[in-house]
Amino acid sequence: MREIDQRIDQYSESDLPDFCRKPTLVLGIGNILFGDDGFGCEVVDYVEAHYPVPEAVCLLDAGTGVRKLLFTLCLSTARPQRLLILDAIDAGRSPGEIFELDPAEIPPVKLDDFSMHQLPTSNLLRELQETCGVEVRVLACQTGPLPEEISQGLSKAVSGAVPQAAEWLVRNYFSCTAAPQADLCPSA
């Protein structure tokens, strides 16, 4: 671990990726090849197509590669102040319902997602929040039944929730109080 810390310390802040240096990081995650699981990625695409993204926000479609990004954040010398995860979750609600979660509230069925390295992504989110001081939230959408085989595209209910989630994101993370930007904030 000390060797990793030494390698990270030799980088200047300008060498770090944007997602480490911006005050707010928004990650859309999921697998677009498994129906509603692609919700987070679709929200990122929708926001990029319909809204200007403030300079203080890094908006990424992380797909199924979220684990590597979270490891990088945990080990980095610079981190965002806030991290929002956009994800599809089965929490027993109505399909297409949008709701907010703290990392500690992630349903047990999600704890083993992307478990290639046997360390659940939710543990990394808690580590970022509790040890690294990053404010972490999850904006989730209740999925319909996920396909057992490859099936690209969201269900009607979840597809209808994409603009609603995008509006929530813009209102809560692109606003003047969340990330002051000259192009979004009126002059005082």
Segment roles from a protein language model:
Residues M1-V134, V138-T143, Q152-Q164, V170-A188:
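N-terminal catalytic or cofactor-binding beta/alpha core of small enzyme domains
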